Amino acid sequence: MSDSLRIIFAGTPDFAARHLDALLSSGHQIVGVFTQPDRPAGRGNKLTPSPVKVLAEQHHLPVFQPKSLRPEENQHLVADLNADVMVVVAYGLILPKAVLDMPRLGCINVHGSLLPRWRGAAPIQRSLWAGDHETGVTIMQMDVGLDTGDMMHKIACPIEADDTSASLYDKLAQLGPQGMLTTLQQMAAGTAKREVQDESLVTYAEKLSKEEARLDWNLPAVQLERCVRAFNPWPVSYFTIDDQPVKVWQATVLAQNADAEPGTIIHADKHGIQVATAEGILNLTQLQPAGKKPMSAQDLLNSRREWFTPGNRL
């Protein structure tokens, strides 16, 4: 293609691999792929390559896996490729200023939110957690800050009432490559525009923790239902009963208020296990006891009905 760019791609998980896949058929020249070192995974803790490495090797692309880009000898790996631009998608390593400045057109990043909202590690999950009605992807020119660079392209996406982090991840994994290719086309043609982020609109998407996934019945049912969707597929919301954790994969909000303390079981049948909250009732419909697969409320009641006697407290 005319205006073909020499591109370094840097990314690690499946989300990044979908962007590399789009680049492979774009006509641009991929001169190198950076991804995190192989990690132990699975029951045998066998060293496992990242999805980006697997795809890159299938297409015989040079792969680099430094543990850090701070040492000068690792920075030379980038410089020696003489790239026009570096595309960074969920790479997981910090790029020092020296590296950001090496490609002729700098480095661009695909971020899973409409910046400046939700800078940081968990933008997809936090948009659900906060009850946002819209999210999207932002392509930005990278600088040394945390997602602070100038914005070059945005694509918005509605958040549906039944979206989970898994479903939203899939939507953004389709939008991201579109935005990336559009931005690269504009950069190649010299028509790319840059918009400074409005610092007054910044919010931060803190990393998720397993502790945060514990359901706090002193919150409103609406907020707890958002947590269930935001923490699916990880770390998965849960409560404990008889000192055993029970994960909650799906839940709905019942608008009526219960005349009971938060955490009290109101009713349990095939339609769900109803629990009182600070405001409204949370109806648990898909659950997973320790050591079992996710199951319907009915299946759990068949084996553990004594746990969910109305009046019991979770």
From Swiss-Prot:
Q: Which family does it belong to?
A: Belongs to the Fmt family.
Give me the reactions it catalyses: L-methionyl-tRNA(fMet) + (6R)-10-formyltetrahydrofolate = N-formyl-L-methionyl-tRNA(fMet) + (6S)-5,6,7,8-tetrahydrofolate + H(+)
Which of this chain's residues are annotated to bind (6S)-5,6,7,8-tetrahydrofolate? S113, L114, L115, P116
Q: Which GO terms describe its cellular component?
A: cytosol
Recorded E.C. number(s)?
Answer: 2.1.2.9
* Disulfide-bonded cysteines: none
Alphabetized, the UniProt keywords read:
Protein biosynthesis, Transferase
What the entry lists under PANTHER family is as follows: METHIONYL-TRNA FORMYLTRANSFERASE, METHIONYL-TRNA FORMYLTRANSFERASE, MITOCHONDRIAL
> What is this protein called in UniProt?
Methionyl-tRNA formyltransferase
Q: What is this protein's function?
A: Attaches a formyl group to the free amino group of methionyl-tRNA(fMet). The formyl group appears to play a dual role in the initiator identity of N-formylmethionyl-tRNA by promoting its recognition by IF2 and preventing the misappropriation of this tRNA by the elongation apparatus.
Catalytic EC class: transferase
Task: Check the record and name the Pfam families matching this protein.
Answer: Formyl_trans_C, Formyl_trans_N
The record's gene field reads fmt
Source organism, top-level taxon = Bacteria
Q: Could you tell me one molecular function GO term of this UniProt entry?
A: methionyl-tRNA formyltransferase activity
Q: What is the lineage of its organism?
A: Bacteria, Pseudomonadati, Pseudomonadota, Gammaproteobacteria, Enterobacterales
For this protein, the record's InterPro entries field holds: Fmt (IPR005794), Formyl_trans_C (IPR005793), Formyl_trans_C_sf (IPR037022), Formyl_transf_N (IPR002376), Formyl_transf_N_sf (IPR036477), Formyl_transferase-like_C_sf (IPR011034), Met-tRNA-FMT_C (IPR044135), Met-tRNA-FMT_N (IPR041711)
Organism of origin: Serratia proteamaculans (strain 568)
